[in-house]
Regions:
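A secondary-structure boundary/capping signal
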Residues: 75, 203-204
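Conserved coil-to-alpha-helix start sites within the AMP-binding
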Residues: 130-134, 154-155, 185
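Conformational gate/switch positions in structured elements
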Residues: 57-58, 152, 211
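Acidic, metal-coordinating catalytic cores used for nucleic-acid/nucleotide bond scission
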Residues: 127-129, 206-210
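Conserved nucleotide-binding/hydrolysis micro-motifs of P-loop NTPases
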Residues: 77-79, 150-155, 207-208
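Phosphate-binding active sites in nucleotide-utilizing proteins
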Residues: 27, 36-140, 144, 148
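Proline- and acidic/polar-enriched loop/turn elements at helix boundaries
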Residues: 17, 75-77, 150, 230-231
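PAPS-dependent sulfotransferases, especially Golgi type II membrane carbohydrate sulfotransferases
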Residues: 1-47, 91-119, 139, 157-201, ...
Length: 271
């Protein structure tokens, strides 16, 4: 039983939404108060694919990395490590350093060099990187940011019924999920206002219902020439190490949209 299992996990992890509220507020305050000097342009373009977990990020990465000029990096932890180690835990050095974003860019690229040696474009598909968009834009001024959006009830239900390791303890309780989703929405609204025209909003429902047009617009946003292989993403043999690997290996089907309606009577807490 999903509800009983999640209740047990909530009791084990002792997750409190207040910690995430504090984190999100700190990021908004930081970028409200300061205008940073961005890093220099990097010859390698990083395509960040982010949003709520289960919003279609694996599918979008599979599409983009089917392009002949793009390396699919997968769910990388590099940015999370750098933000926590170099910024959150060393805030005094962060505020005083003039070259902090150049240094962070170099460290990130050094980590990535072990995976990608040949491509000038690669993807980083860690959904929770939406928390660090201000850092991304300053570290990689020429990066592309794809924000995957999906129906609130669908994405929250999918988080609730799929089990994750690590940072997704908010997904064990429907009330926590509802509050976390609100935090996510508020933060994304802040980023979009702070950095207009830097974030590409990709609606999951639009991708499912109008695939070819949506994919062509997406590839155009990434400043890539059109490659018809992006429409055959399900034939891409790259490894996928997330719970979405089965969906990302299949052609796009319309019945994927709004699957939560089957469980509507259980989901009043999310509305």
């Amino acid at each position: 039983n999903t509800i009983k299992a999640n209740l047990l996990m909530k009791n084990i992890t002792k997750y409190k939404i207040e910690k995430d509220k504090k984190l999100f507020k700190e990021k908004i305050n930081l970028f409200n108060e300061k205008n940073f000097t961005p890093a220099d342009y990097n010859k390698t373009k990083v395509i960040f694919i982010l949003g709520m977990p289960r919003s279609g990020t694996s599918l979008v990465e599979q599409i983009v990395s089917s392009h002949h000029a793009v390396f699919g990096g997968g769910e990388l932890s590099y940015l999370n490590l750098l933000v926590n180690e170099k910024i959150t835990n060393n805030s005094e050095i962060f505020y005083k350093s003039n070259n902090i974003f150049n240094n962070l860019q170099k460290e990130y690229m050094s980590m990535m060099s072990n995976k990608n040696k040949n491509f000038l474009n690669f993807t980083d598909k860690s959904p929770l990187n939406f928390r660090w968009i201000g850092f991304i834009i300053n570290m990689f001024p020429n990066s592309k940011i794809i924000h995957c959006k999906r129906n609130k009830i669908d994405v929250c239900w999918s988080n609730f019924k799929n089990k994750f390791e690590g940072a997704l303890n908010f997904s064990n309780d429907l009330q926590d999920l509802k509050k976390y989703y609100q935090l996510y929405e508020n933060l994304m609204q802040f980023w979009e206002k702070k950095f207009p025209n830097k974030i590409y909003n990709l609606e999951h429902e639009e991708l499912i219902n109008n695939s070819e047009k949506t994919i062509k617009n997406l590839i155009n946003f990434c400043n890539l020439d059109w490659d018809k292989n992006c429409l055959k993403h399900h034939e891409n043999k790259r490894a996928i190490k997330t719970v979405s690997f089965i969906q990302a290996r299949k052609p796009i089907y319309k019945e994927k949209v709004k699957n939560s309606f089957l469980y509507d009577k259980y989901l009043d807490e999310l509305k």
